[in-house]
Amino acid sequence: MTVKTRFAPSPTGYLHIGGVRTALFSWAFARHHKGEFLLRIEDTDLARSTAESVNIILDGMKWVGLNYDNADNVVYQTRRFDRYKEVIAELLEKGHAYYCYCSKEELEAMREKAEKEGTATYDRRWRPEAGKTLPEIPAGVQPVVRFKTPLDGVTKWADLVKGEISIPNEALDDLIIARADGTPTYNFCVVVDDYDMGVTHVIRGDDHVNNTPKQINILKAIGANLPEYGHLPMILNEQGKKISKRSGDTVAITDFGAMGILPEAMLNYLARLGWAHGDDEFFTMEQFIEWFDLKDVSPSPSRMDLKKLYWINGEHIKITTNEKLAEMVKPRLALRDIHETSKPALEDVLALVKDRAQDLNALADECLYFYKKQVPAEADVAKHWDDEASARMLRFAERLEGLEDWNTEAIHDLFKPFCDEEGIKMGKLGMPLRLAVCGTAKTPSVDAVLALIGKEEVLKRIRA
């Protein structure tokens, strides 16, 4: 059997990090088992689904690097209405579905009664049964189609995350599978799609647990093999509450990209939300695929920890090639009015500073003074700069100008003799030198920084 999983987002807005975590686990499960990972766009909500939102999903999947095996044949539910109508007709013909002519007022009265009695909402008055007389069909009412849910027994499954789950069928409604205008409903479309796509494992959020028994019963009615189900726990914010954009939480995957998070780091972090492999916190996607097993997913909710996300991001920055980092940092430097990054080469700058930043925005800031002297902070000036320091910098500039070989080692060899002559410690030279050349007291080793900036530029900045 070829393992087939799917990710099935609705294009009604941004791509939520919870959705990306679901996609990640489905993707990793398929890749671990040498199977297929498929994408389906559940766009039957015609009022809310937009082409822009579809592109947001596709772009988000591309950004995080979750490749799907049906890239040339992504399933769109709105293109499958004929297929849904075909299956509905089959269910009606075989007695697994029926027409219901209840009015909105009747359904509202049933709902209120059910809430008081704790029973299923719909009283099944239009459900055909042996020896039962159905009401007279009202004039001018377009019926819905309801699925004929079994009245006895239980629907159960061995959830790959939550364990055994059992739901009495008497607690389930005869759910609507086609609205009065003929459009199919979510739970029905999902079943037909999973069946036609050959999905073997449905991995999704635990907000779908209540949908599962309904979908299992429909699958049984159409004679399909049942997939296995695994329901993932919710992701909570740092306060332990449901993630919400209204609460100020970052929820869209694109927002994390704007925050300077690497795609690989985002996936690494999301993988650790609810799943564990010993004490491993930092790993590659190749390692994750090798290690991933749904039995290691906790059924309990996970809590966001932005501090840990940034730490993981910093670790991924360290192992990312300077060439790849340069492509991501250049646009950020352009936003900071730095457009020329060949002198010094940005790749060389990144090699020196990438250990000092935990996100791409901070990394871009670390590169600024290599291309343009920054305005020193008042606190740094007060602490490290005075007339004596200014005069000392001019004297040291003469030593620098005399260097024939301009490199880190040659610059470093000037420090001790100069400090001895001046009767000062290295801090009295290094900190003012950083301010004079870079405009900040916080840099990597100052000899390496000067070597990269270049002799002519260094002397010009000191003497400015």
From Swiss-Prot:
Q: Which CDD domains match?
A: GluRS_core
Reactions mediated catalytically = tRNA(Glu) + L-glutamate + ATP = L-glutamyl-tRNA(Glu) + AMP + diphosphate
Q: Which UniProt keywords apply?
A: Aminoacyl-tRNA synthetase, ATP-binding, Cytoplasm, Ligase, Nucleotide-binding, Protein biosynthesis
The cross-references to InterPro entries, in alphabetical order and at most eight, read: aa-tRNA-synth_I_cd-bd, aa-tRNA-synth_I_codon-bd_sub2, aa-tRNA-synth_I_CS, aa_tRNA-synth_I_cd-bd_sf, Glu-tRNA-ligase_bac/mito, Glu/Gln-tRNA-synth, Glu/Gln-tRNA-synth_Ib_cat-dom, GluQ/Sye
A Gene Ontology molecular function term for this protein is:
glutamate-tRNA ligase activity
Quick one: which residues bind ATP?
K245
Where on this chain is 'HIGH' region (motif)?
9-19
Q: What is its EC number?
A: 6.1.1.17
Q: Which GO terms describe its cellular component?
A: cytosol
Query: Where on this chain is 'KMSKS' region (motif)?
Result: 242-246
Biological process (GO) annotations held by this record are: glutamyl-tRNA aminoacylation
Say which domain of life the source belongs to.
Bacteria
Instruction: Report the subcellular localization.
Output: Cytoplasm
- One Pfam family linked to the record: Anticodon_2
The principal localisation class reads cytoplasm
Question: Assembly and partners?
Answer: Monomer.
Q: So what family is this one in?
A: Belongs to the class-I aminoacyl-tRNA synthetase family. Glutamate--tRNA ligase type 1 subfamily.
Q: What does this protein do?
A: Catalyzes the attachment of glutamate to tRNA(Glu) in a two-step reaction: glutamate is first activated by ATP to form Glu-AMP and then transferred to the acceptor end of tRNA(Glu).
Record protein name field: Glutamate--tRNA ligase
Q: Which organism is it from?
A: Neisseria meningitidis serogroup C / serotype 2a (strain ATCC 700532 / DSM 15464 / FAM18)
